[in-house]
From Swiss-Prot:
Binding site for Zn(2+): C406, D408, H653, C668
Pfam family, one: DabA
Function summary: Part of an energy-coupled inorganic carbon pump.
Family annotation (InterPro entries): DabA
Xref: HAMAP family: DabA
Cofactor requirement: Zn(2+)
Subunit details: Forms a complex with DabB.
Membrane topology: Peripheral membrane protein
One annotated Gene Ontology cellular component of this protein: plasma membrane
Protein name: Probable inorganic carbon transporter subunit DabA
Subcellular location: Cell inner membrane
Species per Swiss-Prot/TrEMBL record: Hydrogenobaculum sp. (strain Y04AAS1)
Domain of life: Bacteria
Length: 961
């Protein structure tokens, strides 16, 4: 039964990715099956979080003219009409624009006695019997929390500390110097050893037993209460459970069910110290002390005013205290409405009854956040829809270079500056460039998924060095040693005494230089930093002979590593190969049984693993047909299928920042929180092959013989662009390319100067590269903050419109998308990822403490998977305060993703019908979809699940949202 309950509530656990591959996500992803407004209402209650900004935030935008008066009035009137109170329009407008932000100040006694009808109205809402109050108050609490409130204890803190200490140690990915033993047995198996539990029960049986002993009335809700207590850790465990190929999940498996069993164990363990140890006993105790229990819970939840707490401590009658408290609440709420009515209503009559007015104000307080939000969105939609609809296509000739960037909002400025410098045009595409790969970097031993989190790549690509790299190895080893030393300094209480003395000068450069003298330090570190050798990729598919050879070599190296780790011995290739063949052929004669057991079980040296590795290696690289299709799909995706210029520049992006656990959040979201350089190097290499171009001609795409594809990387922190693999370029083209490089450097500088104006304390654009290595810098760049929309269409439709680095820009030419395949791919990929990014920024802004990550200043890295605040606590989900706020003022403007698609309406609808996940987001209004149909001169939007005309430029431009 426990597993069934768990399956029902797991959707309420937010998404989470480890910080090394940070993926932006909607923390309310589990609510997306519901309409946006209803989902926010439920989530606010469940997470105890704010889901809209405070009224004064929106009022300020209204005063600044950002929220348009006519749009606010229209949305307000529609709401009032829906509840039959449109006669209060003038009063309602004044309430939300002038009074609501001071709501709490109206809850005071005044000279005007509240109307008796108001007293009755609030009496019915506030005064409840003790049984009802008790059940409402404990609904979201664990039993230990309830008892802490009643007995004024802190046992829950002790329980949580025990839970978190175990969980952080079990889930550790190499941070601690003392690894927990027996983790390969799984979380619950390791926990039984950790706690010395003598039980044969599995995690489900164990959790079921404890829940039976606790006997909560609503078992499903009680399980959810436990998981939401530390929902960051629950989210990470959910991530691991959902990603079975995650390396640490394979070697140290964990599940939400095991985590629940651990949590319940500690709660039950400490409840044994109480006279009450289950809900049956709690109910019996409540029957004897109903009023006192209710008061203690009100106090624990910070609801009971201090004067009543004083009376409680003075042993006043609990019944008198509760009666007085509820009575005062009734009168104060009545006074509040009376005070507001005195300001808004000149006289009361039958049409404007005071209880109707109270109901109106109650509904306005419930709805005002959404009214303001929609009005803000509609104001932007009106502005941009008319601009996009009326923009004219510019025909550019004699293009020297087409630069393809990620759709990321941070690409908009540099694209704009490049286009202004000469014969350049730019395109936007998801940053993995249509090349999803599992990438194994040179000098690294693990895969990186360089593709959106929605995709599991089918192709594996290895990076291999092309030449000698002794200098790289030497410098890399120095840097690696220093990095490990620094980790020891953070994580080991003893080794720093020895290491700092031995390497003091090197620590001085980092610990002080990066904080006090970042400019000078940047020069030193650029000299020390290991320069990666020239590398190539395993682009072509391996033959069967190659697969056999590499698989065998891999296992031989595993055997050598095992001997080194387990027995401190070195064995040569021949001996390791003989041992490997003996194990695979099951000829164990003469092999020490202990060695055989270790190799087979701990290191998976067996026939089954060998065959699996060969299957895995069969996924390395692409066939020629696959390579042709890869380039064809890419060129069609961006609409570059004819008039292909001399240079096609494929520019991925990444970021650089030091002392920043959230660094991967600044990298490419479409590459799983990594940078996309390998993707563009692979794609460019394939596109430059003659046989691939011949294959493309057969599908109608002619790439001129002298066209060169050059890969590059855009560092979004410094706005520098670096090109790679330029040796493929003939000498005769060097001068032209040098001009491009020079122009791009100018564009980079102009972009830095533009960004410096928005970055606090940045000074000039020249200072921006220094911020990337400054350890005291909590905000190396704004990242994706202020994102507001995505434009799917031609660059000519946006080129002359001020997008202010707030739009994702996906190139799309609907005329060549005959079967809707391209649009469906956009809707199933960039569209959904864009919503994740947008919603994470939205909720990290509305409630940074609950749905964001809090301030970076107090963060500490834990287990190499995330951060917590202070010395222990929950894993922080969402984005840090410094990403979305500055000096207490929101920098990010939380609105839903405004998605503009330039295509005929019927084409968009047809594609959306086939992408159910995207359709759900549109119909449930998690995004705002606007269709720009330039053929008809009409823009459409969705309203209440139906398509409606938004602007019709054939007649009078009328905005009908």
């Amino acid at each position: 039964m426990v597993k069934a309950y768990l399956d029902n509530v797991r959707k309420y656990i937010p998404h989470y990715w480890p910080m090394t591959t940070f993926v932006h996500h909607n923390p309310l992803h589990g609510f997306e099956d519901m309409p946006f407004k209803e989902a926010l209402k439920q989530a606010s209650k469940l997470y105890k979080a704010k889901v809209y900004m405070d009224p004064d935030y929106y009022v300020e935008l209204y005063k600044e003219g950002i929220i348009k008066r006519d749009i606010l009035e229209k949305n307000l009137f529609e709401f009032l009409k829906s509840i039959g109170l449109q006669m209060y329009f003038a009063e309602s407008k004044k309430f939300i624009t002038e009074i609501s932000q001071d709501w709490k100040y109206y809850k005071v006694k005044s000279s005007t006695t509240p109307d008796i009808n108001l007293i009755d109205y609030f009496n019915q809402k506030i005064v409840k019997d003790e049984d009802t109050l008790f059940q409402e108050l404990i609904e979201d609490m664990m039993l230990s929390e309830i008892l802490d409130a009643i007995l004024e204890d802190n046992t829950t803190d002790i329980i949580e500390k025990e839970i978190l200490e175990f969980v952080a140690r079990f889930l550790d990915e190499g941070q601690t110097t003392m690894s927990m033993p027996e983790r390969e047995k799984g979380m619950f198996g390791a926990f039984k050893l950790y706690e010395g539990l003598n039980t044969s029960l599995n995690e489900e049986e164990y959790a079921d037993t404890i829940l039976h002993e606790l006997s909560p009335k609503n078992v499903e809700r009680y399980i959810l209460n436990h998981l939401l207590k530390d929902f960051g850790w629950a989210a990470f465990i959910k991530y691991r459970e959902d990603n079975e190929d995650y390396y640490f999940q394979q070697i140290h498996p964990a599940s939400l069910l095991e985590y629940l069993a651990v949590r319940l164990h500690y709660e039950k363990k400490y409840l044994n110290h109480y006279p009450i140890s289950n809900f049956v006993e709690l109910q019996k105790a409540f029957e004897q002390n109903k009023t006192l229990f209710v008061l203690k819970l009100l106090k624990a939840k910070n609801i009971l005013p201090s004067k009543y707490i004083d009376r409680l401590e003075e042993k006043d009658s609990p019944k008198a205290i509760l009666s007085d408290y509820l009575s005062e609440e009734v009168f104060l709420e009545a006074y509040r409405i009376q005070n507001i009515a005195n300001e808004l209503l000149l006289h009361l009559d039958k049409q404007k009854d005071i209880t109707d007015f109270a109901f109106l104000i109650e509904k306005l307080k419930e709805e005002e956040g959404y009214i303001w939000l929609k009005s803000l969105e509609d104001s932007y939609i009106k502005e941009y829809t008319i601009d996009f609809l009326q923009s004219n296509e510019k025909i550019q000739r004699d293009i020297l270079a087409s630069a393809v960037f990620c759709i990321d909002v941070r690409s908009e400025a540099i694209r704009r500056h490049i286009e202004r410098l000469g014969n350049y045009n730019t395109y936007g595409v998801a940053g993995f460039f249509g090349t999803p790969i599992a990438f194994i970097e040179f000098d690294k031993g693990h895969e990186q998924y360089l593709c959106p989190a929605l995709i599991k790549p089918q192709k594996i690509i290895f990076e291999l060095p092309e030449d000698e790299h002794h200098d790289y190895k030497t410098k890399h080893n120095i840097n690696y040693t220093f990095k490990k030393t620094l980790e020891s300094l953070k994580n080991n209480p003893y080794t720093p005494f020895f290491m700092v003395e031995a390497m003091g000068w090197l620590f001085g450069v980092n610990l002080f230089g990066k904080t006090l003298f970042p400019d000078f330090t940047l020069k030193i570190l650029s000299f020390i930093k290991a320069k990666k050798p020239k590398t190539r990729f395993t682009i072509d598919k391996l033959s069967q002979e190659e697969i056999e050879f590499y698989a065998q070599k891999f296992f031989i190296q595993k055997i050598q590593e095992a001997y080194h780790q387990e027995f401190k011995k070195h064995i040569n290739d021949k001996k390791a190969k003989d041992l490997f063949e003996a194990i695979i052929n099951e000829n164990h004669k003469g092999i020490d049984e202990r060695i055989l057991e270790i190799l087979k079980t701990k290191y998976n040296i067996n026939k089954e693993s060998f065959e699996l590795e060969k299957i895995r290696l069969s996924n390395v690289g692409y066939t020629e047909e696959e390579q042709i299709k890869l380039v064809e799909n890419f060129l069609k995706l961006i609409g570059l299928t004819e008039n292909i210029p001399k240079f096609v520049l494929l520019i991925a992006h990444g970021s650089t920042s030091d002392n920043n656990p959230f660094e991967s959040a600044l990298d490419c979201g479409a590459c799983g929180g990594n940078n996309g350089l390998p993707n563009v190097r692979i794609l460019a290499s394939i596109a430059n092959r003659n046989q691939i171009r011949k294959g493309l001609e057969k599908v109608g795409i002619k790439i001129p013989e002298d066209t060169i594809f050059i890969p590059g990387i855009h560092n979004t922190t410094t706005d520098e662009i670096t090109f790679y693999d330029t040796e493929v370029m003939p000498q005769k083209d060097r001068a032209l390319f040098d001009k491009i490089v020079k122009d791009f450097k100018i564009a980079s500088q102009k972009t830095r100067e533009e960004r410096a104006k928005t970055l606090p304390y940045a000074g000039s654009g020249d200072r921006i590269p220094v911020r990337a290595i400054d350890w005291s810098e909590t905000r190396p760049e704004w990242g994706l903050s202020k994102n507001m929309g995505v434009y799917v269409g031609k660059r000519s439709s946006t080129q002359n419109i001020a997008l202010k680095n707030r739009f994702f820009m996906q190139s799309y030419t609907w005329e060549i998308d005959k079967d809707n395949k391209i649009l469906k791919n956009i809707l199933s990929g960039p569209f959904i990822i864009g919503e994740w990014i947008n919603m994470e920024h939205y909720f990290s802004t509305t409630d940074n403490e609950r749905l964001g990550a809090g301030s970076k200043v107090y963060h500490n890295v834990v287990a190499k998977v995330g951060v917590w605040t202070g010395n222990y606590g929950d894993l922080r989900t969402g984005l840090p305060y410094q990403t979305v706020y500055h000096d207490g003022v929101p920098y990010h403007e939380p609105i839903r993703l405004l998605t503009f698609i330039e295509a005929p309406a019927e084409k968009v609808l047809e594609a959306a019908q086939e992408v159910k996940e995207a359709l759900k987001l549109v119909v449930n209004e998690w995004v705002r979809l606007i269709i720009i149909d330039k053929l008809k001169g009409v823009a459409y939007t969705f309203k209440d699940g139906n398509l409606e005309v938004l602007v019709d430029s054939r007649g009078i431009n009328q905005f009908v949202i």
